[in-house]
Amino acid sequence: GTCKCDDDGPDVRTATFTGSTEFANCNESWEKCLAVYTPVASCCRKKK
């Protein structure tokens, strides 16, 4: 399933996710998540 940035932290409008805002690739052992409030944005967060 798709993870969402907002599940684990502030939404994209206030930034500072669990991970970092990232439009390309995420670091190894991190996963790309989508932001609910801004469809064009995504973030990376550590895999659980």
From Swiss-Prot:
Subcellular location field: Secreted; Nematocyst
GO annotation, cellular component aspect: extracellular region; nematocyst
One term of GO molecular function: toxin activity
Annotated Pfam families: Toxin_4
Transmembrane segments: none
GO biological process, one term: regulation of signal transduction
Keyword terms of this UniProt record: Disulfide bond, Ion channel impairing toxin, Nematocyst, Neurotoxin, Secreted, Toxin, Voltage-gated sodium channel impairing toxin
Entry superkingdom: Eukaryota
Xref: SUPFAM superfamilies: Defensin-like (SSF57392)
Residue pairs linked by disulfide bridges in the UniProt entry: 3-43, 5-33, 26-44
Note: A synonymy between H.magnifica and R.crispa is controversial.
Described purpose of this protein according to its UniProt entry: Binds to site 3 of voltage-gated sodium channels and inhibits the inactivation process.
Family: Belongs to the sea anemone sodium channel inhibitory toxin family. Type II subfamily.
Record protein name field: Delta-stichotoxin-Hcr1b
Source organism: Radianthus crispa (Leathery sea anemone)
